[in-house]
Regions:
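The feature marks the mature, well-folded catalytic cores of soluble enzymes
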Residues: 1-258
Length: 258
């Protein structure tokens, strides 16, 4: 994956400890298979792995970034602002097509950009949360229109993706019951819009420090908010530093798994 200037976690020349990566991947796979969801495992794309090393820019792939799903069989293939990553989505589209999913793409001549990591879709509430850093507003609106959502909530920031500063929380009935966000990393108008949204929906907004998200230029965060929300579960990499999150999740009947 190419290095982004707005992702402080990416450093030139840093190589992950492969033994730890394999252990963590194995643990995550076992966990996912224990949850009430269907898990599909795929091999690392041969094309990306075997490409000329002088040209190759992919050591890993964030699958979540490659498409946006309406959770009912339709997938919008990401149109990346970073052109070097587009091949990832191209390959993923082939895989999704082979699985029988409906895949659609933003027209090539459109200026809209939309990346999977910039979205959270809550189908039971017909709400689409969208970032506007790697996305642009036109891309967020294109996805919202394609999914025919009732409400689009755009959060502008300089953070790499929305999933590095925000996550929705959904209960066992797949209903949106809270949101967790690092509002200090968002633009003022986006914070105000989010506050109005939660007030209208009568749900809780837990404001977390940058350390629970992507962090700042001076200090890398722990990415606790970088979660996979599932009905009744919130799966993430680590516990939140904020002491407000755990009590709320317990009250809502949502299990936080790290």
């Amino acid at each position: 994956t190419p290095i982004y200037k707005n992702n402080p976690a990416m450093k030139e020349g840093v190589v992950p400890n492969q033994e730890l990566v394999e252990i963590e991947m194995s643990m995550m796979t076992k966990l996912m298979h224990q949850l009430p969801i269907e898990v599909v495992e795929i091999d690392f794309p041969y094309f990306l792995d075997q490409k000329n090393k002088e040209q190759r820019q992919h050591d890993f792939v964030f699958v979540r970034d490659l498409f946006v799903s309406n959770q009912n069989g339709k997938m919008i293939i990401s149109k990346f602002s970073e052109k070097a990553r587009q091949v990832e989505s191209d390959i993923m589209q082939i895989m999704l097509d082979s699985m029988g999913y409906e895949t659609i793409r933003i027209p090539h001549d459109s200026t809209a950009t939309a990346e999977g990591g910039e979205f959270y879709y809550c189908p039971e509430d017909s709400v689409l949360f969208a970032g506007a850093c790697r996305n642009n507003v036109k891309g967020a609106e294109w996805v919202a229109q394609e999914f025919n959502v009732e409400e689009l909530v755009i959060m502008k920031s300089n953070a790499f993706h929305i999933d590095t500063l925000f996550t929705p929380v959904i209960n066992k009935k797949n209903k949106l019951v809270a949101v967790i966000a690092c509002t200090s990393l968002m633009e003022k108008d986006s914070v105000e819009n989010l506050q109005k949204f939660v007030k209208r929906k009568n749900i809780e907004l837990v404001d977390i420090p940058p350390e629970d998200g992507i962090g700042t230029d001076n200090e890398l965060g722990e990415f606790a908010v970088n979660c996979q929300p599932l009905p009744g579960f919130l799966v993430g990499p680590t516990r939140f530093r904020s002491n407000k999150v755990a009590p709320l999740l317990k009250e809502l009947g949502v299990m936080h798994i790290t």
